[in-house]
Swiss-Prot record:
It comes from the Bacteria. The keyword Ligase applies. This is Proline--tRNA ligase. It comes from Nostoc sp. (strain PCC 7120 / SAG 25.82 / UTEX 2576). One of its GO terms (biological process) is prolyl-tRNA aminoacylation.
Amino acid sequence: MRLSQMLFVTLRDDPSDAEIPSHKLLLRAGYIRRIGSGIYAYLPLMWRVLQKVSQIVREEMNATGAQECLLPQLQPSELWKESGRWDTYTKAEGIMFSLIDRREQQLGLGPTHEEVITAIARDMIRSYRQLPLHLYQLQTKFRDEIRPRFGLMRGREFIMKDGYSFHVDEDSLKKTYQDMYQAYSNMLRRAGLAFRPVEADSGAIGGSGSTEFMVLAEAGEDEVLYTDDGKYAANVEKAVSLPADAEPSQFTTFEKRETPGTETIEKVTQFLKASPTQIVKNVLYQTAYDNGVTVLVLVIIRGDQEVNEVKLQNELTKLAANYGAKAIISLTVPSAENQQTWTAKPLPLGYIAPNIADEYIAANKQIHPKFVRFVDKTVVDLKNFITGANEAGCHVVGANWGEQFPLPEIVVDVRKARPGDRAVHDSTQLLKSARGIEVGHIFQLGTKYSQALGATYTNEQGEEKPLVMGCYGVGVSRLAQSAVEQSYDKDGIIWPVAIAPYHAIVTIPNINDAQQVEIAEKLYTELNQSGVETLLDDRNERAGVKFKDADLIGIPYRIVTGRAITNGKVEIVERATRQSQEIPIDEVITTLQQWIRAAIEQKN
């Protein structure tokens, strides 16, 4: 392709609304154009990158025996109501775009396709002889992000590969899950990315287990906790660890103490000259379920620890059926205004005890009349601890479970693991932190969707059983931008060879020099014919402008038909290393073929 004929416009300055380097560079280099909040056009160079990423994804998926298909983007609400996810995805902070058609039918623009694929399986799979089965698609997805940001990293419209597998049992699912683990590792390795698979929370997708594939980058939205021995890595939302040991309490007798102005852990520790590990703090939440019921939640946790709200939401989801609900709409720390809607009398905020009376909750048919009390494992073995006295300005010291306070029945792990904690698998290993960009996520769904939608098969004994499912997603457009976030310098993008829009760019420093033009044209034609995808910069611009643009757009090899041609050579500059060599003109094709092959094979 000739740059003189391409839609090619670069910017010298960073766009004001771009926050991270990859977003700035893709805009500056003319790869993408912002059309609206979280909505981008993929321009010719970007489309070539996306096609290459998609091809790698296809090849790895096809190698596992998965079959490509294409599912509808418009999805009837009835399917989502069958699964119980319609309200979760369309109300409050839900991410589904929903609409009503001219026949007054509710529809959603697909953020994911579990419901659709399960409905297809329900209609078409009858026997164990048809299993296992794995279908996938590459398609545009839509998500109504609360805060679209970072370009293609968190957009409202994006390209994704999503796959769904169906099995007779968990053993069959686990085999496909492992196949996908390997396929995803292959995809990212072939694309030239440094990544780390990590244990992850399954979120709204659900299921018994999942793995995220994180591209390591400082601008990543996710925090990954890992150990140096390589035996543990997890998203902080999922991570577990051993907290520091609690310090012995200096209080041996139970008594109430006046502690005015000590509403925070820091203040009460200073006032009582105690360690936060001796404190039982009681954190109040309110959760709204999809049937309109609000439940008040008390999380009882050690004073030096933080609540992991993802873990907490998972525990509350397990209780949904107790309240006649299927899913959680929201989980918040109630503001003073919110508290007024359900409190019968003012709460002693900052001084709440584990046994705060249910009478604080006003009678209201939409409000559950009792607190749900979760006790975190960090406080179960505490002795002679400090906690609130249910009275403003007062705490109790020297308290014990089974004496002054009953130990709540629901014991959970809802603490947030953090760097420096000891690892569960080896207490000599300390957790370390890294930032990552989630580009892939694989799930063991089990029978969550098949049971909800009645998708069954007949086994060898003639019994009807629910299909066992897995699902597997890769953000194609996010992966492409992640490559930029991981590989750039002050002058521009440095594309991995395997996904670069072109392998090489032939730059003519002076288009008025007939010899430069002739050699450039010949190389351009022959390189493309030999399989080296090549751009020709034949624009009527100064050489310096062309060199800067070549660096900015990140083509792996720049061929310059400059002064070296008088010696029968051209200059080749490798973008990644800046190394420059003069190569005889008749050796350019074989040299580049070797370099490109070596760069790609190194990642395979």
